[in-house]
A protein has these predicted regions:
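Donor nucleotide-activated moiety binding/catalytic core segment of transferases
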Residues: 147-148, 307-358, 363
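Histidine-anchored nucleotide/phosphate-binding helix
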Residues: 10-25, 168-174, 283-288, 589-605
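Conserved catalytic-core segment of nucleotide-activated headgroup transferases in glycan assembly
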Residues: 235-329, 592-594, 601
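A nucleotide-sugar donor-handling region in carbohydrate enzymes
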Residues: 128-136, 185, 200-276, 306, ...
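Conserved N-terminal ligand/cofactor-binding loop architecture of enzyme catalytic domains
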Residues: 11, 25-144, 148-149, 475, ...
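C-terminal amphipathic helix plus adjacent low-complexity
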Residues: 242, 267-270, 298, 397-531
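Short N-terminal targeting/anchoring amphipathic segment
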Residues: 2-4, 90-98, 144-164, 346-351, ...
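Catalytic binding pocket for nucleotide-activated donors in carbohydrate/polymer assembly enzymes
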Residues: 198-201, 221-223, 228, 355-434
Length: 606
């Protein structure tokens, strides 16, 4: 069987690494493709797999089509995704709704929240209208050609349901060619916090009964198309042993081997909601302020999230003893060993909202989260998937509402190396391996894909009359948008030319005003007693004096220099404050360069 596996980027495929390897070992021909590049090691991972198995190849997918139709598709899909988050079940998830609203077309947001929207049936009517319009979108010719060339028996697409996902074009192209399709759900939040499925793939592979219920209730999928397999991405942590001793691990990381340590796992939070470095520093201060002897001098290992390294630039944690900031994206053997060892030897795991909680549960560690109001409303209780960590089989997390409440809970839960936490074990049996802790998910996932490949090929989906009508309605919109896009360079050049012309006219006007002031007000100015006696200035000599040639700088007669002098002179004669900056280097050094300007401002200001 030939399997084409298309991911948004190659790092997504790390969630299916064990399944890809198992399918390859069973002799299936596998093509791994991605829509775009990434820098988290995913490409190297799939190339290592392809190097081991000659029946595995790697290539780039065509990605989204560009131009006017791509923009029309994006707007329609973002509008539909926004309408999804207006459903009552999302009333307590304000940031999910806000995120969708920020990306949606303004007209859709306005109609959905205005009385005029009721004329088309409110949210449901708008959804039906936009869905009908979406069916009129042309199918990507590049993707169809790619599928024709590959001739797969089944196409796997992940994640497929990103907000405004262009991968829906892949799905539509496969259906148009009569190719079997599978959505392998990659993560625990995809079905509840992403976009709505527009049509039903032949199979949707989920982890557990909770995700199956989401697929049925949130996406309206037929029950016979949803297959529960367990979470294959976590199989690699079951039964694993550390790669080194605890002493060697602590020496490698830089922690005191004589004290236990807590692992803080950073999260992929909603942008603009939480500054996690500041939160971590506050948490560290709370631990260090504790008088509990169990926490005295305890080690802290802060593990960054690979997608949010930028926010840690410039953060200095060196002032805290027995604390290290360490860890890489686990996409190769060494990084996986490091990650597992950090969990295995930790005494507890702490974080906000991350899949690392689930991995720590597999290892058997006590897991903690602090539900601070300013954090929880967007990133914890303000999401649907976080609630599984609180509820499944009694819940995984030990939660507190403040650092004062959290610190003694953490001290009480400290565990030795290895696993054994009962809350973690119960959660794993309900969420990760619903068929039993000893029943791996990867073989079930492989069986689901093989079964999908034996299904009768779906009929080729042609365009309905409604789709053609929608296309005819969208065509003039796309044509106008195409004209807008093609004229964009010309409009940009024209705008730039007009701005430059305006600036030249403004400069000329300012020169005339200055000359008028010198000619008509100079005599009156000479009668005023000067408050400050100053020497000559390279930039602005006193009225009536000639510039000293010896003080003339090279380039003074350049047009830009003359223009700058005029602007600075006018600025100096205004009554407004002058703000100097920004300081791009050490402030003292910067100030040395600005001293002549400050001296000039003092002498010639007003």
């Amino acid at each position: 069987m030939k399997i084409l596996f298309i991911a948004r980027h190659y790092s997504y495929l790390r969630l299916f690494e064990s399944a890809v390897v198992a399918l390859a070992e069973r002799g299936h021909q596998i093509v791994l493709a991605a829509d775009r590049a990434e820098t988290m090691g995913g490409r190297q991972m799939v190339e290592r797999i392809a190097g081991r198995y000659p029946n595995v190849t790697v290539c780039d997918a065509p990605g989204r089509y560009t131009g006017a139709w791509a923009e029309v598709a994006r707007k329609l899909r973002l509008g539909l995704d926004y309408l999804r988050f207006l459903e009552p079940r999302y009333l307590e998830t304000p940031h999910l709704r806000q995120r969708a609203e920020e990306r949606a077309p303004r007209v859709v947001v306005w109609l959905a929240n205005s009385p005029l929207g009721t004329l088309v049936g409110g949210r449901r009517g708008l959804t039906a209208l936009l869905s009908a319009a979406e069916r009129g979108l042309p199918i990507s010719a590049a993707m169809k050609q790619f599928l024709v060339e590959q001739q797969p028996d089944v196409v796997l697409i992940t994640p497929l349901i990103d907000i405004g996902s262009p991968q829906l074009d892949h799905f539509a192209a496969a259906r148009a060619l009569g190719i079997r399709t599978v959505l392998p759900v990659g993560s625990w939040d995809h079905l509840s916090s992403k976009a709505l499925l527009r049509a039903a793939p032949d199979r949707v592979v989920v982890w557990n009964p909770m995700q199956r219920q989401e697929a049925l209730e949130l996406h309206g999928l037929p029950a016979d198309r949803v297959v529960v397999t367990g979470a294959q991405c976590y199989d690699q942590w079951f039964g694993r042993q550390p790669s080194r001793s605890r002493e060697d691990f602590c020496a490698r990381v830089g922690l005191d081997p004589g004290r236990p340590f807590v692992l803080y796992t950073c999260s992929s939070l909603f942008r603009g909601t939480v500054n996690e470095p500041e939160l971590v520093e506050a948490w560290v201060r709370a631990l260090r302020a504790s008088t509990d002897p169990r926490l005295k001098g305890i080690g802290i290992l802060v593990r960054p999230h690979p997608a949010r390294l930028d926010e840690w630039r410039g953060v200095d944690l060196s002032g805290h003893k027995n604390l290290v900031f360490w860890g890489a994206h686990p996409v190769d053997a060494e990084a996986k060993d490091d990650y597992f060892d950090s969990m295995y030897y930790s005494a507890a795991v702490v974080g906000i909202n991350t899949s690392a909680f689930i991995e720590a549960a597999v290892v058997g560690k006590p897991v903690h989260a602090v539900l601070l109001p300013e954090v929880s409303r967007d990133n914890q209780e303000g999401t649907l998937h976080f609630r599984y960590l609180l509820n499944v089989n009694g819940g995984l997390l030990r939660v507190a509402r403040s650092f004062d409440e959290h610190v003694p809970m953490l001290a009480d839960s400290l565990a030795p190396a290895g696993g054994g936490d009962e809350k973690a074990a119960r959660f794993v049996e309900g969420f990760v391996r619903p068929f039993g802790r000893g029943e791996a998910a990867t073989p079930r996932f492989v069986a689901a894909i093989e079964e999908a490949g034996t299904l009768p090929a779906p009929a080729r989906e042609g365009r309905s009359i409604g789709a053609w009508l929608a296309y005819l309605v969208l065509f003039p919109v796309a044509s106008l948008l195409a004209l807008h896009l093609r004229s964009q360079p010309w409009r940009k050049r024209t705008r730039h030319r007009l701005v430059k012309q305006f600036e030249r006219q403004r400069t000329l006007a300012l020169r005339r005003i200055k000359q008028f002031a010198i000619d008509h007000l100079g005599a009156a100015g000479k009668q005023r007693k000067s408050a400050t006696t100053v020497g000559g200035s390279v930039l602005t000599p006193k009225t009536g004096r000639q510039r000293d040639p010896a003080k003339t700088l090279a380039g003074t007669d350049l047009r830009e220099a003359r223009h700058t002098r005029e602007l600075v002179t006018v600025m100096g004669r205004s009554n407004r404050p002058i703000i100097v900056g920004p300081w791009l280097s050490e402030t003292g050094f910067e100030l040395l360069y600005w001293i002549p300007f400050v001296a000039w401002a003092k002498a010639y200001g007003n």
